[in-house]
Amino acid sequence: MSEIKEVDVLVIGAGPAGSTAAKWAAKEGAKTLLVDKKSEIGTPKRCAEGISDENIAKLGVEIDPRCIARRIEGATVISPDNTKAKFTHDNIDKNITGVVLERKVFDKLLAVDAIREGTQTMIKTEAISMSRDDDDGC
């Protein structure tokens, strides 16, 4: 069954970037649709759970305490060839602090924020095709 929806903004993928883009588009008044093929937003568990306090501030987001698994000071990055790089206040010029996120909770709360701003959502839905109406000259 194909479902046709007319929207101003179509966002494919309800990860952090998609949900945040949908939230801001809807907040600015765009008729927004967020589509995700997974049956549950935030699953399966994804990588990239650590984020520094500095980058949180740059993003301009407030992290809900329910999303925080633990606070961190520094980090060790391990590459595919097992090379390790350690980042702590002892070996770089600034103190790195941040959080490890519960991505399942974090991703869901970002999607809820988008919905609260007026975003329509379709989960367990794969985007097959789309067309663009160029009436505005774009």
Model-derived segments and their meaning:
Residues 77-138:
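Conserved N-terminal helical subregion
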